[in-house]
From Swiss-Prot:
Gene: nuoB
Cofactor comment: Binds 1 [4Fe-4S] cluster.
Keyword list, A-Z: 4Fe-4S, Cell inner membrane, Cell membrane, Iron, Iron-sulfur, Membrane, Metal-binding, NAD, Quinone, Translocase, Transport, Ubiquinone
Broad class of the protein's primary localization: membrane
Family, per entry: Belongs to the complex I 20 kDa subunit family.
Protein name, entry field: NADH-quinone oxidoreductase subunit B
Cofactor dependence: [4Fe-4S] cluster
Length: 159
């Protein structure tokens, strides 16, 4: 958060967008949408070694309680409508991280008849995390990239 001025009286001046976006970055609540082996790495990021909680993130089981969806794994054609339905149930503002080669573009199963070639065909994706499977560090880097994107977002224009 960039502060435009700090005065001797203890006042701080900044913009409304800076404060709101700073608060949003520290309270992302992801909803897990684990579809394959990438979900294991996502769970690994929530464990003690990487501790995703230090970013203010709590995994939520319900789409109505979350504002971030992490799509991890191979998305099949039958699962596409369910993904869209869950995404539509999330409250605004909402963000999506596509985790792994299969979620990004079909991955190893790209030419299979039953695989969606990227979850961005179903829901808008904000951050892509590459890898097969991506490491927990890669997911944390993707979360940091999303936080930087949120800080740059114009709050009033998005609403």
């Amino acid at each position: 958060m960039s502060l435009e001025g700090v005065f001797k009286e203890g006042f701080v001046t900044t913009s409304y967008d800076s404060v709101v976006n700073w608060a949003k970055t520290g309270s992302l609540w992801p909803m897990t949408f684990g579809l394959a082996c990438c979900a294991v790495e996502m769970m690994h990021a929530g464990a003690a070694r990487y501790d995703i909680d230090r970013f203010g993130m709590l995994f939520r089981p319900s789409p109505r309680q979350s504002d971030l969806m992490i799509v991890a794994g191979t998305l099949c054609n039958k699962m596409g409508p369910a993904l869209r339905k869950v995404y539509d149930q999330m409250a605004e503002p909402r963000w999506v991280i596509s985790m792994g080669s299969c979620a990004n573009g079909g991955g190893y199963y790209h030419y299979s008849y039953s695989v969606v070639r990227g979850c961005d065909r179903i829901v808008p994706v904000d951050v892509y995390v590459p890898g097969c499977p991506p490491t927990a560090e890669a997911l944390l880097y993707g979360i940091i990239q999303l936080q930087q994107k949120i800080r740059r977002t114009n709050t009033i224009a998005r609403a």
